[in-house]
């Protein structure tokens, strides 16, 4: 058995580890380095065509963003992820590919003026769509034999819808070794998704530790603080603009705002409008709505059992096109804009 750390070992992004065991080569995650020019990402140190498969912990781009590049370079194995992760990757990888194409087009306009050589995008939308054809949606808590001597299991880790730690059992020369790749570990008591599952035993654990030495203190009163901000801003005729990650954070905000409206915590403004001004966030919200309720926490499942959509409420509107986004500016009613 051999492990090679290809990313995120001296930095936060670009998670990617090569496991060579039981005659197989598997990547655990295949993330994009972020925070610098993506064209400076290094080529794979192992030929993509020689990789048997990829195990994905969750859909964030720093864990999945190079999957289309892997496929572009002749990878034809399977990509294993939970079903919600596969669904989220279908929109996030396509969105990332659009960005790669746009960035390449912008660089080439500059290159043409300077007489420089054109550049190719890291990957294209076509590459992202090809990568999605290789995904296999897995259930939580179910052991899967990838090959003789190589067994895996996805365990809910409460970071993002579909996120997981991956347990791997490697059997070689009659001895079995258990590895755990933590993925990103979520906090307790987050809305919508379940709390992280505790894994009881392992021979080796490889874990994310970005916040490993931080004491976060008591959980903030998000609903109370947000309702006070909304009340104060609406009372003076203003709008509340919330920049938000499209996947995960936007849905948490919708959950909190539904509770604020239900409890009447903002007074004098009726069913104030809330706009989702992000096509990616709109698609992600649809995936949340279509996900198996078993992926959600007890409170969310209880709402669904009563026929209550936990991230839907009166006054929620979406803007998909640029014209619809511009129309928000013409609406003088105090509102929330999530973008």
Kindly give the residue locations of the regions a language model identified.
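His/Asp/Glu-rich metal-coordinating catalytic cores
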Residues: 1-55, 64, 71-252, 258-267
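Hard-cation-handling environments
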Residues: 229-339
